[in-house]
Regions:
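Long amphipathic alpha-helical segments
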Residues: 1-67
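Short glycine/serine/threonine-rich phosphate/pyrophosphate-binding segments
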Residues: 33, 98-103, 127-128, 147-157, ...
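Short, acidic/small-residue loops that bind anionic groups at enzyme active sites
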Residues: 69, 157-180, 196
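Glycine-rich oxoanion-binding loops at beta->alpha junctions
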Residues: 74-76, 115-136, 181-182, 197
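Glycine-rich phosphate/diphosphate-binding loop of Rossmann-like nucleotide-binding domains
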Residues: 85-128
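Glycine-rich phosphate-binding loop
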Residues: 132-170
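C-terminal binding/interaction regions
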Residues: 172, 176-220, 229, 234-236
Length: 236
């Protein structure tokens, strides 16, 4: 779908991948952004706009059914709530400064139909705060861990739970290794099994978590459709 001479919209992405296209506000000219969002809104029930600064919200004045989540800088355009899939995502944040990126991931996972639970400010500097929250991992299909500074919470959680864990490094921290660099490298070098996305990539973490959780939910609802293989067996 073409929008003037500056955009070609992928309106079939959700049908192909199960994941909607999210409009990145950052870096776009105001009039380009507005025209893209309006064009999507004519074709899709809901449109997500990420990294939208609060002072740009006025650009969409007059458009119906807007929900702006300031902490996550995420705008949702659309009236119909997304259908529930049964997917379950737990989001942990090491510190309060990591919450905005964690919230971006949470809201995106919810937009893909998942139920979410959160536990914030449970970082390793006071690791006793973490342990009571891990009971929720038994409920979850996948866990997202948002952490800045040294990023240690991601590898720690991945070594404690039997669910897929997505590490979400956050650009908190300063000096050598600051702005999320140390957190990213720590998560990439983890010896515990940890999937890692880019710095501040809350949208990507939320999309990937929802994709995993929704597949698990489908298997939970139809347990007989795919029989598990015995250890060492190969499917014909």
């Amino acid at each position: 779908m073409r929008v003037s001479d500056f955009a070609k919209l992928d309106v079939a992405r959700e049908a192909r991948t199960g994941m909607p296209e999210v409009v990145l506000a950052e870096g776009k000219l105001d009039h380009h952004l507005v025209e893209i969002v309006k064009a999507f809104a004519t074709r899709k029930a809901r449109v997500l706009v990420s990294r939208l600064a609060p002072d740009r919200l006025a650009l969409f004045e007059g458009m119906p059914h807007l929900a702006y989540h300031e902490s996550a800088r995420l705008l949702v355009v659309g009236k119909e709530a997304p259908p529930r899939t049964g997917g379950r995502v737990l989001i942990l944040a090491a510190g309060t400064a990591d919450v905005p990126v964690a919230e971006e991931a949470r809201l995106v996972a919810q937009e893909l139909g998942c139920e979410t639970r959160v536990a914030y400010d449970v970082g390793v500097a006071g690791i006793h705060r973490l342990f009571p929250e891990l009971d929720a991992a038994d409920w979850a299909d996948v866990v997202i861990v948002a952490a800045g500074r040294e990023g240690a919470l991601g590898p720690v959680v991945a070594g404690l739970v039997d669910r897929p864990v997505i590490g979400l490094p956050v650009s908190t921290g300063y000096g050598m290794g600051g702005k999320g660099e140390a957190a990213l490298l720590s998560m990439l070098q983890a010896c515990s099994p940890l999937l890692t996305v880019n710095i501040d990539a809350g949208v990507v973490a939320g999309l990937c978590a929802a994709q995993i959780a929704n597949r698990v939910a489908g298997a939970r609802e139809s347990p007989g459709e795919s029989e598990p293989l015995e250890s060492g067996a190969r499917r014909a």
